[in-house]
Amino acid sequence: MSEEIKKDDLQEEVEATETEETVEEVIEEIPEKSELELANERADEFENKYLRAHAEMQNIQRRSSEERQQLQRYRSQDLAKAILPSLDNLERALAVEGLTDDVKKGLEMTRDSLIQALKEEGVEEVEVDSFDHNFHMAVQTLPADDEHPADSIAEVFQKGYKLHERLLRPAMVVVYN
């Protein structure tokens, strides 16, 4: 019996040793795989970070370019807003009766040269065909009738202007309602 116990103990030791060796081999293989997997994961992570940083840089450059174009396009906005009251005064002066022909001609030439300079910068007069709340400000309303349909403009108190598609000043109008 003691021989059997010894054999069993010996066999258990051999099995335990084999199991330990197998476990050690598996453990040794796992760290190698894990290190490779970790390296691949880190490489993927760095690649993703690089791609995101590159895309962000391209977006910044695109936005910067668009902002420069917008600034260039609307660079004369403040100057145009400052000139519009002078243009209004010229219009009022031309509306005065009793001006000599020479004075009237001089005022018209000055007005026309200002309008031309503003047009070259992209400033346009707002159209007053029919009322549009985006471009017109109703300062008074009149009742609509058969001759004057609703939302038609009766009178323009002050002209409106826009720079390209951006409104500088709405036209102040009387509207049939």
Swiss-Prot record:
This is Protein GrpE. It is found in: Cytoplasm. The keyword Iron does not apply. Belongs to the GrpE family. GO terms for molecular function: adenyl-nucleotide exchange factor activity; protein homodimerization activity; protein-folding chaperone binding; unfolded protein binding. Gene3D superfamilies: 3.90.20.20, Head domain of nucleotide exchange factor GrpE. GO terms for cellular component: cytoplasm.
